[in-house]
């Protein structure tokens, strides 16, 4: 790096004027100098032989900061020049032994070589510590680059913020595009599909029941859900007593033994009779009955489960489960994942990944209001055959055996009841052939002997039990075809009655 001071000293001795034609690098730097130390403005520089000061003084803090720009090739090691004013006053910042010798026409720039070793300046040190360690060393000024750093930092921040905003915008665009293409799927919807319980079904359970009246109590529970305002209909709800009165029974209802004449076909017939009374439409059928008379041939357990779970989500369907000596109403289900990490999994699970539990509303006050039974246990109950049976309400007893000589068959099943709309046309809407009308009014049913079953009840006695036929809907052959279950009590069961008087 050229010695600027020597060059300027030679020019001053020759003509006493500043260079006008040829500009040195220091003159180009003069416009960049914005402030200087007023305390060192005009003091004479004490000569040390050649007027040069070694670049060995550290950078110190002063009240006024002077700016200097270093050349590219010596930016980290040395400053190019320091602005010097022509004020001849002594600098109070310098030691007493140090003076600035300058003539009237002296140069404004003093070169500073880098011959001696540098003293590293730690910016964390205080000014007092620095003044003690400096001693008599010449003074140098701090090269303040804060404005330049601020500019670069701001530009970096601006560019960084712009990049972040662009990336955020791209991310949001991607998310928006993904949400448009694949709408957000909530796990709650999947849970709702796996855990189904319509509280209206539970509200409609007629509880408690009369002794052995579980059949009519379950039927009224289904009817109220399908047709009354307590469930999914628009009619006033009815009670067991009102239904029994419609069916032709007279009080005291506690004395009626419903067991001997209440069967699957009886419940379906009563359902139609109550519908005729209120001028509403509906149908009933056996959903799943793997064994016995009028079994659902070809229906599998998985197929029945699929229909049952779909039906429990449908407010136009209700169910009655006929188990050991009892009727009650399925009202919901839960598909429980087999693995714990699938508890809140999204999307449907395969049948192999879940096990189904059926929620069953109980009409008897002697049992819990809601049973929760495995579908596998229900299938076991429906698939047992006489003399073997399984009491679904007492699974702790395991498989049991009846005392009977007859082998095979099972009355247990699941019956479906469906509400039909007036706009729907089906077999129920059309009269076929000769219309049969009931000529005898229904009378009290208590005169029937306990030992009589549906096999032995004559048509005349059916009339006394409250059976009636709608003149606008049915003919004998059509009724037999639609009911599909002219199943009789104790048919194929010698010495076995499905009711023992327990509720």
From Swiss-Prot:
Q: Which GO terms describe its cellular component?
A: cytoplasm; extracellular space; nucleus
Instruction: Show the segment(s) annotated as Disordered.
Output: 1-33, 152-184, 438-469
Annotated tissue distribution: Widely expressed. Expressed at higher level in spleen, ovary, small intestine, colon, peripheral blood leukocytes and liver. Also expressed in testis, ovary, aorta, appendix, trachea, pituitary gland, bladder, uterus, spinal cord, salivary gland, stomach, mammary gland and bone marrow. Weakly or not expressed in fetal spleen, adult thymus and certain cancer cell lines.
Q: Which GO terms describe its molecular function?
A: DNA endonuclease activity; single-stranded DNA binding
Q: Where in the cell is it found?
A: Cytoplasm; Nucleus
Q: Does the keyword NADP apply?
A: no
Q: Where is the composition biased (Basic and acidic residues)?
A: 1-26, 173-184
- Keywords of this protein's UniProt record, alphabetized? Cytoplasm, Nucleus
**Top-rank taxon:** Eukaryota
Q: Where is the composition biased (Basic residues)?
A: 155-172
Query: Between which residues do disulfide bridges form?
Result: none
By sequence similarity, the record places it as follows: Belongs to the BIVM family.
User: PANTHER family attached here?
Assistant: BASIC IMMUNOGLOBULIN-LIKE VARIABLE MOTIF-CONTAINING PROTEIN, DNA REPAIR PROTEIN COMPLEMENTING XP-G CELLS-RELATED
Per its record, how is this protein called by name? Basic immunoglobulin-like variable motif-containing protein
The organism named in the record is Homo sapiens
């Amino acid at each position: 790096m050229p010695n600027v001071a020597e060059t300027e000293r030679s020019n001053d001795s020759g003509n006493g004027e500043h260079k006008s034609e040829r500009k040195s690098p220091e003159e180009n730097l003069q416009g960049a100098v914005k402030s200087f130390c007023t305390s060192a403005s005009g003091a004479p520089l004490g000569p040390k032989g050649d007027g040069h000061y070694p670049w060995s003084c550290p950078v110190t803090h002063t009240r006024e900061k002077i700016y200097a720009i270093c050349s590219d090739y010596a930016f980290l090691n040395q400053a190019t020049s320091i602005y010097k004013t022509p004020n001849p006053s002594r600098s109070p910042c310098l030691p007493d032994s140090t003076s600035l010798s300058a003539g009237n026409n002296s140069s404004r720039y003093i070169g500073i070589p880098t011959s001696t070793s540098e003293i590293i300046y730690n910016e964390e040190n205080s000014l007092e510590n620095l003044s003690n360690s400096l001693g008599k060393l010449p003074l140098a000024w701090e090269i303040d680059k804060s404005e330049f750093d601020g500019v670069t930092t701001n530009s970096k921040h601006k560019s960084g913020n712009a990049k972040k905003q662009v990336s955020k915008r791209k991310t949001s665009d991607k998310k928006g595009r993904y949400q448009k293409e694949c709408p957000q799927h909530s796990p709650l919807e999947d849970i709702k599909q796996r855990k189904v319980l319509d509280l209206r079904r539970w509200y409609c359970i007629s509880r408690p029941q009369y002794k052995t009246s579980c059949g009519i109590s379950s039927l009224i529970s289904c009817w109220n859900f399908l047709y009354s305002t307590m469930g999914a209909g628009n009619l006033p709800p009815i009670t067991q007593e009102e239904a029994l009165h419609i069916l032709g029974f007279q009080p005291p209802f506690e004395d009626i033994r419903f067991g001997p004449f209440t069967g699957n076909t009886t419940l379906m017939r009563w359902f139609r009779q109550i519908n005729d009374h209120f001028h509403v439409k509906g149908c009933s059928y056996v959903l799943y009955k793997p064994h016995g008379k009028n079994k659902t041939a070809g229906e599998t357990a998985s197929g029945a489960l699929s229909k049952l779970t779909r039906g429990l989500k449908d407010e136009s369907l209700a169910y009655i489960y006929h188990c050991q000596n009892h009727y009650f109403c399925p009202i919901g289900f839960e598909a429980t994942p087999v693995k714990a990490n699938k508890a809140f999994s999204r999307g449907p699970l395969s049948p192999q990944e879940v096990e189904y539990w059926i929620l069953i509303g109980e009409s008897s006050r002697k049992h819990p209001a809601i049973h929760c039974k495995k579908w596998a246990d229900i299938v076991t109950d429906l698939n047992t055959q006489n003399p073997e049976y399984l009491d679904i309400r007492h699974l702790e007893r395991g498989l049991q055996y009846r005392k009977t000589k007859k082998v095979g068959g099972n009355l247990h099943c699941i019956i479906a009841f469906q509400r039909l709309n007036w706009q729907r046309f089906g077999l129920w809407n059309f009269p076929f052939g000769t219309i049969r009308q009931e000529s005898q009014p229904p009378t009290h049913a208590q005169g029937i002997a306990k030992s009589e079953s549906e096999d032995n009840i004559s048509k005349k006695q059916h009339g006394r039990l409250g059976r009636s036929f709608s003149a606008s809907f049915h003919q004998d052959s059509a009724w037999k075809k639609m009911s599909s279950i002219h199943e009789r009590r104790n048919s194929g069961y010698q010495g076995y009655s499905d009711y023992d008087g327990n509720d």
